[in-house]
């Protein structure tokens, strides 16, 4: 049986209801009020955005959700896990600073931020995945697992490997610790089309693990032993010389060994 999907557009034909009030009504209509949150820790999982990036949900939406949680006696907190790649969210201190710069403060959202996998991204819980095909034991940020109630507050976006990312990515990849993310990316390691590479070294500058190397001809190659499959190099290559093996050979029957 298909699930009911509730939708609200951005139109506000009446001054009596703004967009935040509309979101609150949408959530209550969908059954939010039936969830027992009294005295419970409620994780609101979202993406705080990299510094300089505008493609994230505004803090106003987080406040609407947090206020509803508190109205039902819950203790909300915003959360996300650290990233594999270079940027403003690789450790908890930088991650929280990035969130504050982008407006996610306790005063604007009505609740605090907890980076789920800790200071260095290694505070995790191993969660068995029954019937897991690629990952049989997922490494999840501890604060996510410690929460009593979990809410996914997701923005829709394009993705270099998957085409687009939404709620499943926000939870599946976003709740993974740094090691958990590495395992999920493991089958998607990139390679360089030598004839397209111009030796600009953009890939080397963005890589946090020193995977790109350059030969006498100044052409890049990827050291797969060092590569974690985060795909940041794909995004920065100006000539699209770096491509993902899992996308090029997606129709081939070979699959990576499951990670236990």
Describe the predicted segments one by one.
Residues 1-33:
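N-terminal basic/disordered segments at the start of proteins
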Residues 34-45:
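N-terminal glycine-rich anion-binding loops that anchor highly charged ligand groups
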Residues 12, 177-235, 241-251:
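Ferredoxin-like iron-sulfur electron-transfer modules
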Residues 3, 7-14, 50-58, 228, ...:
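Metallocofactor- and cofactor-centric catalytic cores in central/energy metabolism, strongly enriched
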Residues 55-72:
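Histidine-anchored nucleotide/phosphate-binding helix
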Residues 248-260:
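Single conserved hydrophobic/aromatic residue that forms the stacking wall/gate
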Residues 85-165:
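An acidic, phosphate/nucleotide-engaging active-site surface
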Residues 74-77:
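Residues at the starts of beta-strands that form the adenosine-phosphate
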């Amino acid at each position: 049986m298909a699930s009911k999907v509730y939708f609200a557009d951005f139109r506000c034909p009446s001054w009596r209801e703004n967009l935040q009030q509309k979101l609150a009504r949408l959530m209550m209509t969908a059954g939010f009020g039936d969830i027992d949150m009294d005295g419970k820790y409620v994780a609101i999982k979202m993406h705080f955005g990299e510094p300089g990036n505008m493609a994230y949900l505004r803090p106003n939406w987080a406040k609407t959700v947090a206020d509803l949680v508190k109205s039902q006696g819950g203790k909300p907190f915003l959360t996300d896990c650290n990233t594999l790649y270079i940027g403003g969210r690789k450790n908890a201190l930088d991650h929280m600073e990035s969130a504050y710069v982008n407006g996610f403060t306790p005063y604007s959202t009505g609740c605090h931020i907890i980076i789920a996998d800790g200071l260095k991204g290694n505070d995790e819980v191993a969660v068995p995945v029954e019937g897991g095909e690629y990952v049989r034991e997922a490494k999840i940020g501890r604060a996510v697992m410690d929460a009593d109630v979990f809410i996914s507050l997701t923005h829709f976006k394009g993705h270099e490997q998957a085409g687009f990312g939404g709620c499943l990515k926000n939870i599946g990849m976003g709740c993974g610790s740094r090691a958990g993310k590495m395992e999920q990316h493991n089958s998607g390691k990139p390679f360089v089309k030598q004839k397209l590479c111009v030796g600009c070294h953009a890939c080397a500058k963005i890589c946090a693990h020193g995977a790109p190397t350059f030969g006498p001809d100044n052409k890049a190659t990827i050291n797969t032993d060092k590569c974690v499959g985060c795909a940041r190099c794909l995004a920065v290559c100006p000539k699209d010389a770096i491509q993902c093996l899992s996308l090029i050979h997606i129709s081939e029957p070979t699959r990576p060994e499951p990670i236990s």
